[in-house]
Amino acid sequence: KVFGRCELAAAMKRHGLDNYRGYSLGNWVCAAKFESNFNSQATNRNTDGSTDYGVLQINSRWWCNDGRTPGSRNLCNIPCSALLSSDITATVNCAKKIVSDGNGMNAWVAWRNRCKGTDVHAWIRGCRL
């Protein structure tokens, strides 16, 4: 599913991401834009053999199990396929674990490069939340 900007913002808010660990909703929407273009079915293979999955491009080396990543830790205890659903519950629950891991949202390269230090509120402007 390719989410609309405000549609994804509303779903993320409903799942408790707004100000989770101090990151406003705009940060999460911005990250999703530049990680997946709001596409829940996005997958991208990495040079180390791992794959990133879903709207927040969660990585199979650490966070989920896709059955083909050597040495996968599966710290979210989920199949990576769960991260491709139009229901973002699994994605949000895993993202909460990732953002609590010590590096905050710096875990997302796209957030670090394209959202951090910018006016992220713009990503939820005009949304009825």
Curated annotation (Swiss-Prot):
GO cellular component: extracellular region
Active site: E35, D52
UniProt EC number: 3.2.1.17
GO biological process: defense response to Gram-negative bacterium; defense response to Gram-positive bacterium; killing of cells of another organism
Keyword Disulfide bond: yes
Keyword annotations: Antimicrobial, Bacteriolytic enzyme, Disulfide bond, Glycosidase, Hydrolase, Secreted
Alphabetized GO MF terms: lysozyme activity
C-type lysozyme domain location: 1-129
Protein origin, superkingdom: Eukaryota
PANTHER family registered for this protein in UniProt: LYSOZYME C
Protein name per UniProt: Lysozyme C
